[in-house]
Each structure stands twice: as structure tokens, then as C-alpha cells.
A protein has these predicted regions:
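Cytochrome P450 heme-thiolate "Cys pocket" and heme-binding signature region
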Residues: 283, 319-348, 371-374
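Cytochrome P450 heme-binding "Cys pocket" and the immediately downstream C-terminal segment
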Residues: 224-226, 341-378, 382
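Conserved cytochrome P450 catalytic core segment spanning the I/J/K helices
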Residues: 39, 43, 122-123, 145-213, ...
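Conserved cytochrome P450 K-helix/beta-meander segment immediately N-terminal to the heme-binding cysteine loop
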Residues: 295-321
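Cytochrome P450 substrate-recognition site 1
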Residues: 1-50, 54, 78, 82-91, ...
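Cytochrome P450
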Residues: 42-53, 64-92, 101-110, 134-156, ...
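Conserved cytochrome P450 K-helix E-x-x-R motif and the immediately C-terminal K′/meander segment
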Residues: 155, 159, 244-283, 304
């Protein structure tokens, strides 16, 4: 995938590109190294406790907000708080450091970092279809803000790398310290490539996780029977007594189905795009190498030819014995599937597990949400959700 403004920043600042911006052998080389720490079952199990800690902290954060309200409930547009949660969780797993974004007053450096991530994402869309040379020539404020934001994000990565090396030098007993520390220890990827990939993970893993969480909370709020069923599933999984998070999550197929159902109705990207590297004959159609091929995920997910009663939110449909493999394509598939898939799925499952254990969720309006497509699919207006603590 190419995002011209991101590539231009890397070129002007003499940074390498990560796999989000690469193709060919460079992409393959980086991808094989990253797979071991980011998408393999072994790698995933290592960062689950980091994500779980942040999910628990978010529940505490929400309880604090509820206690400020005499009605013993909280009605809120949760989008900005979800943005903070996903940035805090993904950064902890990636860098091995907490930002403190769920505290009442985040530290100045942390606030500067989250502001930079927000600015980078907000300025990416209007720059998406403009040649970077035009922006540079005009020295447009939009372009300068975009560059400054990326500079702050890369500086944050530099600081975290220095902290990791300091820990190595102290010779303390080895323990897991996040994905970046593992990549540095392996020494299978150049330092500048590690930094490039970690910053792209940061950029690609915030809104793309926060928005599906918002849609899921809304659907659970307007489908209370589904919410209750998942809550009972969570209780059942926890009653098994396992302290291993991966086993607990494996015991939550309905919760996983709820996330799949959200991504069926509200895919983050409305298409999956691929360019075949060789000529292909597919169902009697000849597709030359290099042809752009797209699967329309939004229309696929709402097609009655593929899904029965497609407008209904029904996580149970994913528990059937039918082959659903190529009906759920929100993360792509195969060697080109989203590299952040396990990180995003784990974040969402742990977040929802803790939220549903602690709160009942209602919504002010059960009307369908109108959506808009910017850089990703999102609600035109975020829903108002009500959280009531479960005694």
C-alpha cells in the first residue's frame, strides 16, 4: 500500500519505510521477522498480559467517571476515550512503556505524543490524493503539521529504543518488555527498519481498533439479549479457573463472533485490494498480472446471497459448522493478512470482556448509525452510550 505523504516524510527525513509502505522482497524480508513476534500464537501470548492490564485500567477509569455522577451511571460519547485506550494498549505492547493516557492528567510528553498521532491521522486524509511535491512547494500548513507530527512519533520511538538499551546494559534478569525489545534482541532486522515498522504499527492500530470497538458497544447496547449471552459466556470461561489469558479468550467464541459480526457490518476498510504477481484464470475470467483486484467488503457483508438476514446483528452465525473462512475478510487472509490482526483482535476481546463483566450498556437511540468513509469507515455521529455498573 502506498500513502504518498507518509512515503514523502520517510524520504525527506531519510527514514526507512515499514511493511505498510513496502512491496516485493523488502516487504517479505521484514514481514517474516515481524510474524514471529506480532502474529504467531507464541508471540501473541507474550503481549496479552500487557493489553489485559490496560483493559483493566480502562474499567477503573470508567468507574471513576461513573462515581462523579449522582445517577450511578454514565452517558457518554466514548470515541475519544477509546482512542486513548487503543493508543495506550498498543503502545504498551509495542514499546513496553505506559503512556498514562488513562490518568486524570497525562504527562506532558504523553499528551504531546497522543496529539501528534491525532494530527498525523487527521492530516493524512486531506493529503491522500495530493502529490506531496505540491504540498512541499507551497509549504502548506497542513503539510507542515503532518511532517511535524511524524517527527514527534519517530522521536518517541528513538526515546523508547534508548530506554530499552539502557535496560539491556544494566544486566537485569531478562523478562518480556514488548515487541520492539524482542526485535532488538533478535538482531534479525536493522535498527532503522525496526523503528519504521513500530511507528507504522502505532499509526495503523489506533482508529482501526477504536472505531470497531465503538460499533460493537453500540450493537451490544441495542441488542441486550446478545449482550447478556456474551456476559454469561464470560462468566463460564472464567469459572474454569484458568489464569492463562489465551485459554480464557479461546473459551469466548461468541465474543469473537460479535467482533466478526461488527466487522461484517462495519468493515474498517470497505475493500480488500490485491495486485496478482502472475496471470490468473479465476472462474473462467482471465486476470493479467498487475491488475487491481478488489473485494467489496461492505457490500459482501450485507449481501443476502452470502448472509441470511444480513441486516441483523447475530454473532451466533459465526458459530455454525458452515465454512465461514472467506466470509470474514476484514483482516485479509494468507501471507498478506493484516500484520496487526492478533494485536487488534486481542485488544478488542480483552476490552469487551472486562467491560461486559463490569457494566451493562444501553444506548440513547437504537436507530441505525449513519456512516461516512474517510480514511476508514466510521459513524457520521458517534452514538451516546450509557454504562451502568454491575453490582
Amino acid at each position: 500500500m502506498g500513502i504518498n505523504s507518509w512515503i514523502a516524510h520517510r524520504t525527506m527525513r531519510n527514514h526507512k519505510c515499514g511493511i505498510f509502505l513496502l512491496n516485493g522482497e523488502q516487504w517479505r524480508s521484514d514481514r517474516l521477522v515481524l510474524n514471529k513476534e506480532v502474529i504467531s500464537p507464541v508471540g501473541t501470548r507474550k503481549f496479552l498480559p500487557f493489553l489485559n492490564t490496560v483493559a483493566e485500567d480502562f474499567v477503573d477509569f470508567l468507574h471513576r467517571q461513573v462515581r462523579k455522577n449522582t445517577r450511578r451511571s454514565l452517558t457518554v460519547d466514548l470515541y475519544r476515550d477509546l482512542f486513548r485506550f487503543t493508543l495506550e494498549a498498543s503502545s504498551y505492547a509495542l514499546y513496553g512503556e505506559r503512556l498514562g493516557l488513562l490518568e486524570e492528567t497525562p504527562k506532558p510528553d504523553s499528551q504531546k505524543f497522543i496529539d501528534a498521532v491525532e494530527t498525523m491521522l487527521q492530516t493524512t486524509l486531506p493529503l491522500l490524493f495530493l502529490p506531496p511535491g505540491v504540498m512541499r512547494w507551497m509549504n502548506n500548513k497542513l503539510w507542515q503539521d503532518h511532517m511535524d507530527a511524524w517527527d514527534i512519533i519517530f522521536s518517541h520511538a528513538d526515546k523508547c529504543i534508548q530506554n530499552i538499551y539502557q535496560e539491556f546494559c544494566l544486566g537485569k534478569p531478562r523478562k518480556y518488555s514488548g515487541i520492539m525489545a524482542e526485535l532488538l534482541l533478535q538482531e534479525e532486522m536493522p535498527l532503522d527498519s525496526i523503528k519504521a515498522n513500530i511507528t507504522e504499527f502505532t499509526a495503523g492500530g489506533v482508529d482501526t481498533t477504536a472505531i470497531p470497538l465503538l460499533f460493537t458497544l453500540f450493537e451490544l447496547a441495542r441488542n441486550p439479549h446478545v449482550q447478556t449471552a456474551i456476559r454469561e459466556e464470560i462468566k463460564g470461561a472464567e469459572s474454569q479457573g484458568s489464569r492463562e489469558l489465551s485459554k480464557v479468550l479461546n473459551g469466548l467464541p461468541l465474543l469473537k463472533g460479535a467482533i466478526k459480526e461488527t466487522l461484517r457490518l462495519y468493515p474498517v476498510g470497505i475493500t480488500v485490494q490485491r495486485y496478482p504477481t502472475r496471470d490468473v484464470v479465476l472462474q473462467n475470467y482471465y486476470v493479467p498480472a498487475g491488475t487491481l483486484c478488489q473485494v467489496g467488503l461492505y457490500s459482501l457483508g450485507r449481501s443476502p446471497e452470502v448472509f441470511s438476514d444480513p441486516e441483523r446483528y447475530d454473532p451466533q452465525r459465526w458459530l455454525s459448522k458452515d465454512d465461514n473462512s472467506f466470509k470474514a475478510l476484514a483482516f485479509g487472509f494468507g501471507s498478506r493478512q493484516c500484520i496487526g490482526r492478533r494485536l487488534a483482535e486481542s485488544e478488542m476481546m480483552l476490552f469487551l470482556m472486562h467491560i461486559l463483566r463490569n457494566f451493562k450498556i444501553d444506548t440513547v437511540s437504537k436507530a441505525d448509525l449513519k456512516t461516512v468513509y474517510g480514511f476508514i469507515l466510521m459513524p457520521e455521529k458517534p452514538p451516546l452510550l450509557t454504562f451502568r455498573p454491575i453490582d
